[in-house]
Amino acid sequence: MGNCLHQAELSPSTENSSQLNLEDLWNFSYNGNDSFPEIDYDASLAAAAPCHSCSLLNDSSLPFFILASDLGILASSTVLFMLFRPLFRWQLCPGWPVLAQLAVGSALFSIVVPILAPGLGNTHSSALCSLGYCVWYGSAFAQALLLGCHASLGPKLGAGQVPGLTLGLPVGLWGATALLTLPITLASGASDGLCTPIYSTELEALQATHAVACFAIFVLLPLGLFGAKGLKKALGMGPGPWMNILWVWFIFWWPHGLVLGLDFLVGSKLSLLPTCLAQQVLDLLLNLAEALAIVHCVATPLLLALFCHQTTRTLLPSLPLPERWSSPVDTLGSKS
């Protein structure tokens, strides 16, 4: 929204010279010796300059993008290896195929982080930027929807009680994700060597659709899960959505969905900010929300590892003796 232009610093004398004194105008007389008050038009133009706002995620933040990408790829790859490792106890996690897809989504996000990072000069092209935004938001949408399904289905994921889950759920979720990413894919590109969404009247409908999608998935979805959990518990209708450590994921994206929606309202003139300071605060919140969203690619594999460790530690001792004999851990021990 705001720009990072050099803002002229006005001295008190300059500020006073840019305003007409009402008393001087009242006492003004049209004598030959009188002259019109001098107005500093340069100062007036400087005062009317756009609101000054510099981005936190500028060229100097490139190491942050690179570090987050590297750590995210490493952590996601490790979790995927442990989930697909033959005869390993993490395959006892309820719905471990869904967990594997979460790790894949986190890895995809980590891969495209450097593409959208500032400070890479003029290496960006519009096609590459559009692809980057497509994968960026597509992986985030997919992870949010997978978490919603994982919370709603709960332990049924590991009991084979959901027919068609193995193929139907991934196809449906990733297909919906592809549709949700179309607006930002078409409304993004490269500008001055930076990947950025394109704001124009022709693309306003696409930007509105993207803002609504982010608000619904990142803000309303977790609120709906919490509301359903509390309502079912209050009415005694059952346990409700399965609450676990994976819900922490929404903390990294909830601010982004909220602030992005507010920024669209301001940019489309549907809501006006009263002062320049309010605009600067909004720009700062946008940068902080984006940085927090980037950190999720490192946190998600850690959350998955913690969840698998907790569930397998509590699940394995509770299994009946014949099932424990056929579990991957015991099979691995017998082979060794």
Curated annotation (Swiss-Prot):
Example GO BP: chemokine-mediated signaling pathway
Protein's cellular compartments: Early endosome; Recycling endosome; Membrane
Molecular function terms, GO-annotated: C-C chemokine binding; G protein-coupled receptor activity
The organism's place on the tree of life at top rank: Eukaryota
Keywords assigned by UniProt, alphabetized: Disulfide bond, Endosome, G-protein coupled receptor, Glycoprotein, Membrane, Receptor, Transducer, Transmembrane, Transmembrane helix
Keyword match tRNA processing: no
Chief site of localization: other
Protein name: Atypical chemokine receptor 1
Residue intervals on the Extracellular side: 1-63, 117-129, 188-207, 266-287
Cellular component terms per the entry's GO annotation: early endosome; membrane; recycling endosome
Residue spans, topological domain Cytoplasmic: 85-95, 154-166, 229-244, 309-336
Encoding gene per record: ACKR1
Taxonomy of the source species: Eukaryota, Metazoa, Chordata, Craniata, Vertebrata
PANTHER family in alphabetical order: ATYPICAL CHEMOKINE RECEPTOR 1, DUFFY ANTIGEN/CHEMOKINE RECEPTOR
Chain segments annotated as transmembrane: 64-84, 96-116, 130-153, 167-187, 208-228, 245-265, 288-308
Bilayer topology term: Multi-pass membrane protein
Glycosylated sites: N16, N27, N33, N58
Family according to the record: Belongs to the G-protein coupled receptor 1 family. Atypical chemokine receptor subfamily.
Disulfide bridge partners, by residue number: C51-C276, C129-C195
Record function comment: Atypical chemokine receptor that controls chemokine levels and localization via high-affinity chemokine binding that is uncoupled from classic ligand-driven signal transduction cascades, resulting instead in chemokine sequestration, degradation, or transcytosis. Also known as interceptor (internalizing receptor) or chemokine-scavenging receptor or chemokine decoy receptor. Has a promiscuous chemokine-binding profile, interacting with inflammatory chemokines of both the CXC and the CC subfamilies but not with homeostatic chemokines.
